[in-house]
Amino acid sequence: MKKKYKKLIILCKGDSVTGGSELVHQFCHELNSLSLDSSIAYYPLSEKYLVPEEYSIYDVKLSKLEDEHDNIIMLPEVATKFAYKIKTAKIAIWWLSVDNY
């Protein structure tokens, strides 16, 4: 089966240790364990972040927001404002909350 994308980049708030942030790290870890190229880009995008110590158990790669044709950029519902910055990549919105927006 041919992959329909080159890389999945999941946007996550930097320095955030919450249930939603942990879910993003778990998801990225599981995709990588299945040999699917996925990474996390922390925002604000102008800052540099490290993976929080609490999430060091997850195998995740960090990347920049790579707005390329073959990429998918997944945004949490609280960061849909970044959709306007993405011109080329495909966009997916992951609704991590039950009733928050």
What are these regions (language model features)?
Residues 64-101:
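Catalytic core of nucleotide-activated saccharide and alditol-phosphate transferases
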